[in-house]
């Protein structure tokens, strides 16, 4: 579960994006849930608690910063990890593009807000919002990190 936090209920503000993804033994990434809502801190915290109960993620990544600290306090006891923006959003998306290019990303059709994520991907980087794209990239990168090494697609090819 990866979270790109925002706390504003204004229509023009970025929502808090949440993406749940899983990885199979063949290196396929499955996007299972997408959330993108303008909630208060407490409403977002409750939603994250529900996602934790539903999906039991090994880790819950929250983009670091002031809002990340607020959520970390609110969600103490959950398997939280801080996510750092180590490059601009376009570079981060490019870092996982090989999984799209090789057909290793699957979007579950009944996943919440999957069409909204698709629309953001098609409009990126010129769309009004990119929060779901960023959360998805974080989710994929969290799945592929083994210690400090980013695992490559080749590591999943079975002989």
Predicted regions and their residues:
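Conserved phosphate-binding/catalytic loops in two-lobed NTP-binding clefts
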Residues: 79-93
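Short, surface-exposed amphipathic charged segments that create phosphate/polyanion-binding patches used
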Residues: 92-103, 120-123
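RNase H-like, metal-dependent nuclease domains and their acidic two-metal-ion catalytic environment used
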Residues: 1-83, 105-159
